[in-house]
Design a protein with these regions (language model features):
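Generic protein-terminus/edge-of-domain signal
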Residues: 1-61
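Residue-level detector of conserved, well-ordered beta-strand and adjacent loop positions
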Residues: 45, 61, 69, 77, ...
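Short beta-strand His + acidic residue motifs that chelate non-heme Fe in jelly-roll/DSBH
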Residues: 50-52, 68, 74-80
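A short glycine/small-residue-enriched secondary-structure motif
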Residues: 57-59, 68, 103-106
Length: 140
């Protein structure tokens, strides 16, 4: 759900959530090419989802996770039915943590972590943190 789009620039409305926006998306709606200063994580929980960034199309399956870094031009294509979790957070949250600035500079534009990733520990780490954020966000 893009609320504020000026050309290709999306202003993320974090509301009162301290720089975090999460929504359970089940809309059959494609999102045009856009970019934002926040970092975005997407995980389909029912059916797939397509993320297009640059010349790459990422065909996400259920439980795959994709991380879209700040400033990356991307578009999203939804199937007719499905559900996905979309988490957007301000990069300033991470920049305030000691030594994260260097780490964020090394983060590639897109990080695609499939459910059946060879690096199971990475997937489990990212997924468990995402599940915890969703639980805490939904309880507030």
């Amino acid at each position: 759900m893009i609320e504020i789009l000026d050309g290709m620039y999306e202003t993320i409305n974090y509301g009162d959530s301290l720089g975090i926006r999460l929504f359970h998306n089940d809309e059959y709606e494609d999102y045009p090419e856009h970019w934002h200063t926040g970092i975005e994580m997407i995980m389909p929980v029912e059916n797939g989802y397509t993320v297009c960034a640059g010349k790459e199309n990422y065909e996400l399956r259920e439980n795959d996770v994709i991380i879209i870094n700040t400033g990356v031009l991307h578009s999203l294509k939804a199937p007719e039915t499905g559900k996905r979790i979309i988490l957007q957070f301000s990069a300033s949250l991470l920049y305030s943590v000691k030594e994260m600035e260097t780490l964020l500079a090394l983060l590639p534009p897109i990080v695609y972590i499939p459910y059946d990733a060879k690096d199971e520990k990475l997937y489990e780490f990212v997924r468990s943190r995402m599940d915890r954020i969703v639980t805490e966000y939904d309880e507030k």
